[in-house]
Amino acid sequence: MHRIDTKTAQKDKFGAGKNGFTRGNPQTGTPATDLDDDYFDMLQEELCSVVEASGASLEKGRHDQLLTALRALLLSRKNPFGDIKSDGTVQTALENLGLGEGAKLNAATATLGRTGFIAIPVMIGGIEQSVIIQWGWNAAKASASGGDGNTVVFPVAFNNACVAVVANYDNVSAPINAVATGGYTTTSFLLRCAAQTGSYYYNWIAIGY
């Protein structure tokens, strides 16, 4: 591409080396800028190349091909990155951006409170799964033969398995009663304390997937 460079171009009109056009001035003997085939060929090919780069063929009767081509070649503000999806090149785009499998993962979900959970998406072998961490505060009832195993229901069910539950006594005052967990399923576990009388509360945290 080039700016007009005929002998009658207005030299440095837009700055050093940036020629422009002049309509001329007969009173001062300044001629109007001449146009040549080099300049018109440049304009033609610059514009036509944009249309053809979009995959379209030139049509003499159409006057919107340049605009149509620009919309096709540039990202649409109405549907950001929609062209990447429609071209079937999402994977290529992620690779070009240097993003790994994690870029495809959904956002983590959670419920916060005294009892709650967080589900963290992970990619394992190209398959999205979730590591789930849950927590709560529940009672373990005592009995004459030692604490009963109270069933505690998880805030949400694990998709595959619960692998561990850790509990601690929710009181620093004596007596401090030992606690145990067991009987893990995807929906619940057993919480048992060592006391033979009373009812004692324990904090717990569970991990699964």
From Swiss-Prot:
Biased composition (Polar residues): 22-31
Domain of life of the organism encoding this protein: Bacteria
Protein name: Uncharacterized protein StfP
Protein family membership: To E.coli YfdL and M.jannaschii MJ0347.
UniProt xrefs under Pfam families: Gp53-like_C
Gene3D superfamilies cross-referenced by the UniProt entry: 2.60.40.3940
Sequence ranges of Basic and acidic residues compositional bias: 1-15
Family matches, as InterPro entries: Gp53-like_C (IPR054075)
Region (Disordered): 1-34
Organism lineage: Bacteria, Pseudomonadati, Pseudomonadota, Gammaproteobacteria, Enterobacterales
